[in-house]
Amino acid sequence: MLSPKRTKFRKQHRGRMKGIASKGNTIAFGQFALQAQDCGWVTARQIEASRRAMTRYVKRGGKIWIRIFPDKPVTMRPAETRMGSGKGNPEFWVAVVKPGRILFEMGGEEITEEIAKEAMRLAQYKLPVKTKFISSDKIVGGDSPVEKAIEKESTEEVKK
């Protein structure tokens, strides 16, 4: 199970999940990825279950990258405890996921789009957030201004 080796503080506030992911929202390592569509907490157990499902389907061919890490402790009080007497002890770890965040990436010579899509579909069932399959050959965020300028220059050269 994934968890930090050490943290500065044992307990954290629950926090708010608003906005979209500004970091970790592009494919960096593989050709295919699983991208979050809404926000939520993904536990270390859910990450491990998803990883196992994908690894089992691809039969250890190719490579899988986990792009999220559970670094937030979630505390719980013992059952039937009276109110007060402080905050509970950390029980498990979660990764805070915002829309647009890449959760898993997959790549390799043996991995085709069909294999990756099916493996990611199996992983989707293990996760509490809505996700979608994306591949690196399709531009995720639309055309950037730089790409539009390059395309415009190339079409002008063809016309001359």
From Swiss-Prot:
PROSITE patterns: RIBOSOMAL_L16_1 (PS00586), RIBOSOMAL_L16_2 (PS00701). It comes from the Bacteria. Pfam families: Ribosomal_L16 (PF00252). GO terms for cellular component: ribonucleoprotein complex; ribosome. GO terms for molecular function: rRNA binding; structural constituent of ribosome; tRNA binding. Gene3D superfamilies: Ribosomal protein L10e/L16. Signal peptide: none annotated. One of its GO terms (biological process) is translation. Keywords: Ribonucleoprotein, Ribosomal protein, RNA-binding, rRNA-binding, tRNA-binding. PANTHER family: 50S/60S RIBOSOMAL PROTEIN L16, LARGE RIBOSOMAL SUBUNIT PROTEIN UL16M. Belongs to the universal ribosomal protein uL16 family. Binds 23S rRNA and is also seen to make contacts with the A and possibly P site tRNAs. Part of the 50S ribosomal subunit. This is Large ribosomal subunit protein uL16.
